[in-house]
Amino acid sequence: MKRLLAIALLALVVVPAAEAKRLPKNYHLWIKMGRCEQPGRQWPGRIYWSHPGPTYGGGLGIYQGTWNAWKVKGMPSRPGLATWRQQMWVANRIAADVGFSAWSCWSRIR
């Protein structure tokens, strides 16, 4: 039983790292979402992945409380401190649970 638990816990850390080697699921959608969430930024067409917040952070404008609920142990404490791959990985978890409508831009990009 202890061995099974150890394997399950290891999978929580290793799976996100393994998935980081290829483009995240819904990659192109998240790029569109990031561009929509950050209109008029100083980098036209680019996404400011390290956006500090304070309420909505990172390139996808993830609410801090939502980030805390869906990130896994070992990930940065704030979305703006996470890599773009980590942000997309968490965003996919959010979308799988509550849908893409968690982002206000969803209605504009779909």
Model-derived features: where do they sit?
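Peptidoglycan cell-wall recognition and remodeling modules
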Residues: 23-110
